Amino acid sequence: MPICSVHPLAYHADPTGYFSLVRHAPGAVLLDSGRPEADRGRFDILSAWPLEILAPVADETGTAFLQRLRDSLARLGDAQLPEHSPLPFAGGLIGYLAYDFGRMLEPLPAQAVDDLHLPSARLGLYGWAMVSDHQARSSQLVFHPALADDERQRLIGLFEQSLPTADDASFHLSAPFATDIDAEHYRQAIERIHAYIQAGDCYQVNFAQRFRAQYSGDPWAAYQALRVACPTPFAGYLSLADNDAILSLSPERFVKVSQRQVETRPIKGTRPRGNTPAEDAAYAEELLASEKDRAENLMIVDLLRNDLGRTCRTGSVRVPQLFGLESYPNVHHLVSVVTGELPAAKDALDLLGGSFPGGSITGAPKIRSMQIIDELEPSRRSLYCGSLLYLDVRGEMDSSIAIRSLLAQDGQISCWGGGGIVADSQWEAEYQETFTKVRVLMQTLEAL
């Protein structure tokens, strides 16, 4: 088996300095664990100059596109990291699946307007990466054996130079964020969801609204401000064409595969952070004790057990954590963990095909909930509730749910906030929660 070469670099907890060296390059991508402010994530991965870019073509099925991804990894070729290396990436795919990639996997109506025209998936095939391991306090370049030696030497020279001490990038909104739907429209949508629940169509539907603003400047400057204001373990920045970008500050894992072991960490249940320690603790205790939030979370856990069971070895799906508390700068969340094991005949792409999009951001049952979302949300979700991910040539994968995420495109920046609607949901509280989840993002950018 060919072995990747690893070149040590000076360790930096903050990945933005290293990323600044490549951020203008084609296909520049950063998967960011939010250090040094966040403390849950272990690795940062960044790369650029992909060997190829893969995106769906007209009338291609989701299964066919996933097979093209599988074929691209095979073209790059099998490789292993040096013995005992814990690094997560040995060369392979990095990119995103938009929520609307789900349309390529399941039959859905086409009622919501596709006004952002973002491709439903875009992944680069990368022969190298700069990986920081915050547990070992190390940074290193990882080179797939197929990468040409002169390219390795060029990258070593690039990353061994002094990092820039300042970035002159700036970002400015021309007006505050505005929502696409007003409170009355939101109330009517929740009434419609309640009618579907009472009719037996569904138990829970994730309903979201979009916020938009015009901007000038560089989205990278916006991301740098956001990662300080809202550090999260599944953040990321993806450069797109024409200085457009994806900016993600997600707290939520979708699915991880490591040595054929599968983990998903659904979030369902939210409270704001308090202004005082006592108020903050009260919100956390209220969330942990909330029968409504626990019921919502359990519905999604059951859905994800089913989704993982479509691909994982029979009898391997477990729930090692139910209703755990995770706290972030803006919110407390209720988080559960579902695990499983891939059988020899299945891989991470089979798992994606059987479980995308995530159950925590659709509802239960999933397909009917997605049909209702398409009926009631006026525009397609685009990036929102899709996934940022890597998948390497060994089959190792990690992926996020693209919540708390923004799309900067054609001088307009969009973000979304949503929540799970169940039979006893009060529309006013749910409406306010959509603002709570993204307020820190919007206020941070409005202050620039």
Say what each PLM segment does.
Residues 1-448:
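Extended alpha-helical targeting/anchoring segments
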